[in-house]
Amino acid sequence: MMEGLDDGPDFLSEEDRGLKAINVDLQSDAALQVDISDALSERDRVKFTVHTKSSLPNFKQNEFSVVRQHEEFIWLHDSFVENEDYAGYIIPPAPPRPDFDASREKLQKLGEGEGSMTKEEFTKMKQELEAEYLAIFKKTVAMHEVFLCRVAAHPILRKDLNFHVFLEYNQDLSVRGKNKKEKLEDFFKNMVKSADGVIVSGVKDVDDFFEHERTFLLEYHNRVKDASAKSDRMTRSHKSAADDYNRIGSSLYALGTQDSTDICKFFLKVSELFDKTRKIEARVSADEDLKLSDLLKYYLRESQAAKDLLYRRSRSLVDYENANKALDKARAKNKDVLQAETSQQLCCQKFEKISESAKQELIDFKTRRVAAFRKNLVELAELELKHAKGNLQLLQNCLAVLNGDT
């Protein structure tokens, strides 16, 4: 009856919903290519098949695959953070833990309420919830793949022994999740780090570049955090509107099937309009979630990683200044001068090493995020225009049918 929009699924196609959905403008390198070729959900666990192609001499084979779980990704991330050799680099943020509880709860509630709805309504809602679950699953896989690709693209981190073990060792890494005691220890470490961060933040940086970056990143992180929360609200609003269209369309359809009068035919035609409009609105929500919300969430975590880098450098600067003071005291007292000089030299070398790599890391971070935001925002704008035109076409076709023009 109404043309201008196909009757495809409510969620994005396989191509759009694929593992490349979260775009961070990664630079590919033929020497080491990593992707997640498959994933399997087993209750509360997801098993990722990590596929690697490499021409590097460090690996025994040119192509291989291993199965990894989320805890092993966290282990790899933590090993980077805890390694002093990587203090001058932005450590790619760890992927978030897979969370399907909300989708499972919706499916459970749907099953409990099956008796209160028609077979068609139940089938439609079941398909939508299953598609929603699949979308979350694909997003989870994508975020884990992005982490690996960021590491593989990094000229230093890609050489890490733990990373090679993660990619190549075809047995279980025997990594477990942290227990309550370890989580409590992490909590206190973060408290100490926060308090220490207040102390080092009051130290005037000797380099204007880093002073500017510290001020900028603090503001940038807060703005991205605020934008992420607002983007989520916007996405939920579109999803809520789609749900409302569904309920209105179902009610009109029920009215339209009561009789064969003209008013009932009118109800059926308008019901079809709401059904197709619902599909567009659901796609709008999905597009905004993929192209904007996911990107903001990723760069919220990566900007925190950049802030952590600046904290490590500031901490190193404070240690260097304290070492200088200790050396002056040792010389004044003519006691333990050699030990103080050695400590001062080590602190100086560490600070200079971190500063050298940190500057390039922050420059690359800016280039990467600007390219990613430009690409995703342009694509989102094009999709919004496409959906707006689709809505307009639907309304025009519906009016033409109701007016008897077609």
From Swiss-Prot:
Upper taxonomic lineage: Eukaryota, Metazoa, Chordata, Craniata, Vertebrata
Source organism of this protein record: Mus musculus (Mouse)
Highest taxon listed in the record's lineage: Eukaryota
Family classification: Belongs to the sorting nexin family.
Annotated a 1,2-diacyl-sn-glycero-3-phospho-(1D-myo-inositol-4,5-bisphosphate) binding sites: 41-47, 100-106, 114-117
InterPro entries in the cross-refs: AH/BAR_dom_sf, BAR_SNX6, PX_dom, PX_dom_sf, PX_SNX6, SNX5/SNX6/SNX32, Vps5_C
Entries under Pfam families matching the protein: PX (PF00787), Vps5 (PF09325)
Cysteine disulfide partners in this protein: none
Membrane-binding amphipathic helix: annotated segments: 182-199
Protein's name according to its UniProt entry: Sorting nexin-6
Biological role stated in the UniProt entry: Involved in several stages of intracellular trafficking. Interacts with membranes phosphatidylinositol 3,4-bisphosphate and/or phosphatidylinositol 4,5-bisphosphate. Acts in part as component of the retromer membrane-deforming SNX-BAR subcomplex. The SNX-BAR retromer mediates retrograde transport of cargo proteins from endosomes to the trans-Golgi network (TGN) and is involved in endosome-to-plasma membrane transport for cargo protein recycling. The SNX-BAR subcomplex functions to deform the donor membrane into a tubular profile called endosome-to-TGN transport carrier (ETC).
Positions of the PX domain: 26-173
